[in-house]
Amino acid sequence: MSSTRIPVIALLAAAGRGTRLGGPIPKAFVTLRERTLLERSLQAMLTSESVDEIIILVSPDMETYARDLLRKRGLLNDPEGVRIRLVHGGGERADSVWAGLQAILLDDATPDAIVLIHDSARALTPPGMIARVVRKVHEGATAVIPVLPVSDTIKRVSLDAGVVVDTPNRAELRAVQTPQGFLLSELVAANKKFFADPNPGFIPTDDASLMEWYGADVVCVQGDPMAFKVTTPIDMMLAQRITDEAEPTIFEVPGD
């Protein structure tokens, strides 16, 4: 748990259907070596010793399943002094995050609280990376994202004709991961503005893009290849191989 007086609250997104993974259940509840992706993401948050509360965003039809699962694992009894609770997510990611923020606001959280938003499908995220994001917000950043350099050449393509428009300079491009960290007051203000606008002009694919739209500076920290998102069957094969070979070391806390 965080030793600072400023609370750190994590929103763990687990409401997505995960159709690209090809399974019959939401991907957060897909099992990887006897533990669901949700459990693994939750454990990484706990092991990071950086959070005071974790809010799991689930679809209403999965709430009972999720609650029973976490209760069996002893994860609803404030493990390590961290409060864990379930909140209904929405149809889109932005809706789920807004539901989580409203739950935080109902608890009268301090405006300078730190909010982490994390994809449960990034189940092998190292705890040290989580701590790194939190630390950067503590240092004064309003919005923080973990990133990695891209190795592929990226093309911008016209959506209608499928023709290459240009080739961005790869040195300026980064692949963005989660958890992303934010100052609560600024994240709430950005969401209020977005949901009040009948025509915001875009659909945010992550929370940092919403903060960019709002006008906030988004600061980057070093990401980690282990924080990849389990989205497709190939991703799951990779995650299985990694856990088969490196399970005992995945949740060790690096000294960074």
UniProtKB/Swiss-Prot annotation:
Keywords carried by this UniProt record: Isoprene biosynthesis, Nucleotidyltransferase, Transferase
Annotated site residue numbers, Transition state stabilizer: 20, 27
Site (Positions MEP for the nucleophilic attack): 170, 229
Involved pathway(s): Isoprenoid biosynthesis; isopentenyl diphosphate biosynthesis via DXP pathway; isopentenyl diphosphate from 1-deoxy-D-xylulose 5-phosphate: step 2/6
Enzyme Commission number: 2.7.7.60
Family matches, as InterPro entries: IspD, IspD/TarI, IspD/TarI_cytidylyltransf_bact, ISPD_synthase_CS, Nucleotide-diphossugar_trans
Enzyme class at the top of the EC tree: transferase
Similarity section: Belongs to the IspD/TarI cytidylyltransferase family. IspD subfamily.
HAMAP family assigned to the protein according to its UniProt record, in alphabetical order: IspD (MF_00108)
The protein's name: 2-C-methyl-D-erythritol 4-phosphate cytidylyltransferase
Gene: ispD
